[in-house]
């Protein structure tokens, strides 16, 4: 069966109403030794959005992850029981804990932490032992997100990545180290070890490529092309001065040209290593041809089975492999006579209690952390409740941050970015400096205090809402809604741009368009000086000593009855 015929059969299956999401996803409990059957002769492992988490962590999946229009009630916009039902996963087990927020505290206490590079390294070695020639790909957001990554300027993650055996990577938050530092790492550390690919990053003046667009690797005699797609909106979502002179973008036409080029040069398998975000990748897969798979990241979505997206040339698999080192995707292709005959995919949760740490990686991590032990372990406070970040509108750790900003900067209102990275703490856990830095470790940490009119406040909220809920995925930037403290509002995600935010109140009184309010914030994309967010939050936490159960304030969500991306 040739590739075109294989695609036709898949299309017929779709037309017949075949429920593709539930196919091939076996309960993880049946294979807790990670001994998954091998298929074919081309093997790709995929991780993404690790955010510099070298140690095992807790990470709660979202309770609110809204999909609208064509994304409504389909992956990745399924949460809780809806996700379990869609993929045929049983409640109460390891799979349910890994992929959903359900019974999170009890399940986390039962199954323990996830991820950690020493445990991940053991899993990678096991997969490679059963899959000769397997490649390890990283989708970006690898060098940022922890205290040690910030304090070492990313060097800790570069060294750990080489030890782990990453073959190819692309980027996003890597660029917030600054273009000079990125190029220094490529030249001094990655050269000859890790291919950094990004087809969509060009020189502003002349259009020359900044990075290699792709790499071709031969796996068991099969030429495999891996094209890189860095985050398209880096100079908008992050400080543009950090990548001065570089242009980004989705660049759909240029991607199609590159696919055609590598196909003409003999590539039998072509994949896109993407940091677009899931919805953007799904649209892209429907519009370009010749891609066998998009291995995606940025939106931190743990999708148990690839979406099979039809296009004019056949079908493209679209995956997204979660975040924080919590998952490892394994994609197998059976390639014969230059054609893909079959494929299989598993998204494996990395349970630290099931994977003994790799001694060499453990030794490296201990060496990395040793100079900073006292700072990392400094106890700032104790939390009585669950502290987490992920969710479209707020998380309890973000609520803690905006509360700290209001108190410490004497503000009326506080705004905090809708970052999707940031780990979870269980009730009773100490909040250490390391835990705090896992929420705020960025290279532009200044806090700000600004006077804003009510009209300006609404504009800011509307602008961020459009980045998330724009009906066209190509205009979405993939984060969550800006977190707010002190301010209450309602949101209608299906409304037109500029008309989604309503009912803004402060202390029970309507926010007035012409009245001025003191608004605290942090992470300005312009070059602004201010006290670092971690210093502000650390001081506040020390003054509180004990953080009582945090109620993460949520807006009133209108017009989304029956949306499976919202769980009560």
Predicted regions and their residues:
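Residue-level signal for pocket-adjacent positions within structured domains
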Residues: 212, 241-243, 313, 345-346, ...
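Short, solvent-exposed loop/turn motifs
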Residues: 223, 386-387, 488, 510
């Amino acid at each position: 069966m040739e590739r075109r015929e294989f695609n036709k059969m898949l299309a017929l299956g779709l037309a017949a109403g075949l429920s593709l999401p539930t196919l091939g996803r076996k309960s993880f409990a049946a294979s807790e030794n990670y001994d998954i059957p091998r298929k074919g002769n081309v093997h790709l492992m995929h991780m993404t959005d690790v955010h510099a988490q070298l140690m095992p962590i807790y990470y709660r999946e979202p309770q609110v992850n809204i999909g609208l229009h064509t994304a409504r009630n389909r992956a990745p916009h399924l949460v809780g029981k809806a996700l379990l039902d869609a993929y045929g996963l049983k409640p109460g087990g390891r799979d349910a804990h890994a992929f959903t927020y359900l019974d999170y505290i009890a399940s986390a206490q039962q199954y323990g932490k996830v991820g950690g590079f020493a445990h991940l390294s053991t899993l990678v070695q096991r997969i490679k032992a059963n899959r000769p020639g397997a490649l390890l790909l990283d989708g970006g957001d690898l060098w940022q997100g922890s205290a040690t990554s910030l304090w070492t300027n990313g060097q800790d993650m570069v060294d750990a990545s080489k030890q782990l055996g990453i073959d190819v990577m692309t980027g996003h938050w890597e660029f917030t180290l600054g273009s000079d530092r990125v190029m220094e790492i490529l030249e001094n550390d990655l050269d000859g070890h890790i291919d950094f690919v990004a087809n969509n990053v060009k020189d502003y003046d002349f259009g020359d490529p900044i990075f290699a667009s792709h790499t071709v690797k031969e796996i068991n005699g099969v030429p495999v092309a891996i094209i890189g797609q860095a985050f398209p909106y880096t100079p908008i979502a992050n400080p543009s001065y950090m990548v001065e002179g570089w242009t980004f973008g989705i660049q759909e036409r240029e991607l199609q040209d590159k696919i055609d080029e590598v196909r003409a040069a003999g590539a039998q398998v072509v994949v896109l290593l993407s940091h677009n975000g899931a919805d953007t990748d799904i649209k892209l897969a429907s519009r370009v041809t010749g891609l066998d798979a998009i291995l995606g990241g940025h939106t931190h979505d743990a999708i148990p089975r690839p979406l099979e997206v039809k296009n004019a040339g056949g079908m493209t698999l679209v995956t997204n492999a979660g975040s924080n080192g919590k998952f490892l995707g394994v994609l197998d292709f059976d390639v014969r006579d230059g054609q893909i005959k079959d494929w299989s995919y598993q998204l494996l949760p990395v349970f630290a209690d099931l994977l003994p740490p790799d001694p060499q990686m453990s030794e490296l991590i201990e060496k990395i952390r040793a100079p900073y032990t006292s700072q990392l372990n400094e106890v700032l406070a104790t939390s009585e409740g669950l502290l987490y970040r992920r969710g479209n509108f707020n998380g309890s750790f973000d609520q803690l941050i905006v509360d700290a900003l209001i108190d410490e900067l004497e503000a009326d209102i506080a705004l905090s970015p809708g970052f999707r990275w940031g780990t979870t703490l269980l009730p009773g856990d100490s909040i250490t400096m390391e835990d705090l830095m896992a929420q705020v470790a960025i290279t532009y940490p200044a806090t700000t205090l600004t006077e804003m009119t009510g009209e300006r406040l609404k504009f800011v909220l509307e602008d961020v809402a459009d980045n998330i809920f724009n009906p066209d995925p190509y205009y979405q930037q993939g984060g969550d809604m800006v977190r707010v403290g002190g301010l209450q509002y309602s949101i209608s995600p299906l409304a037109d741009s500029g008309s989604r935010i309503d009912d803004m109140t402060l202390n029970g009184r309507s926010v007035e368009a012409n009245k001025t309010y003191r608004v605290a914030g942090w992470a300005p994309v312009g070059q602004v000086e201010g006290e670092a967010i971690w210093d502000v939050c650390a001081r506040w936490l020390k003054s509180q000593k004990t953080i009582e159960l945090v109620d993460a304030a949520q807006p009133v969500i209108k017009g989304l009855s029956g949306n499976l991306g919202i769980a009560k």
